[in-house]
Amino acid sequence: MVANNGTADALVAALKRKGGIQMTVLPLYNVMLIPETNLYLQTQAFTAMTGKEPENQDRLIIAAEKSPKKREEITEDDLYPIGVSGIITEINSDNNYIVIRTKKRADITDITIFADHTINVTATKREDTPGEDIDPDDERARLDKLKQALVGYFSNSQWGSASRGYIAQFGSISEIAAAMSPWLFNSAEDRYKVLEEDSKAKRLDLMEKMIYENIEMSNIGTEAANAQEADYQKIYRESALKKQID
C-alpha cells in the first residue's frame, strides 16, 4: 500500500493510540539475515535505504529485498515476508560504518510505503521450532572444523598467516555466515531459505553447507579465488574491528 503524507500522519497517530512502537524499516539486498549476530553496514548505505541518519540504540526491522533496488523503487512486493529485528549498537564516525545487533526473526505484514519512500510494517515475532536443543559439543566441533577449512582456503594467499587470527575470533557458524554473506555466490532466494527455516538446527545445517560449498567453488580456479581475495580481506578486517568494539 502507498500512503500520502496525510495518511502517514494518521497512521502514526493510530499507532500511538494502540501503543505501537515505531521502528525504522531497513531493506537490504545480498545480506544473509541471521538472528543474534552482528551486522556491519556502511553509514551511507543505511541512510540511502532508510532516508535518515543512524542513531545509537535505534530499533530496526531489517527486511530482505528480493532484488537490488533503490529506496525510491521499492514496492511492497519487493520484500520477503520474514525479516529480523535489530538495534544499532555502534556508530563509527571515523570509519563510516555502523554495527547492528540482530535480535529475533519477525513476520512482516501490512507493508505501507509513504510518499517520501519510508516504509512502515507490522512485525510479529516468529517463533523457532519449540523444544529443540543443539548439542553444544557438536556445534563447537563443527565450528572448529569450519575454521580449519577457512584457514586452509587462505593459506596460499599473501595474507594467509594474518587470516588465522581473524578466523580464530569467530564464536559461531552464524557469525561466519553473517560476515561472509555479501561475498557468497548464493542467490537472494537461497539466503532467504535460511532465514525462513524455523528449526535452529536446520538453519545451522544450511549455513554450514552454504559456506563449505562456497569454499569449494572458490577453490575450483585459482584465478577466481584470487579475484575474491580483496573482498575476503575486508570481511576479516571487519571481524577484527568487531572484537575491538566488543
What would you call each of these model-derived segments?
Residues 2-246:
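N-terminal low-complexity, acidic/polar interaction/targeting segments
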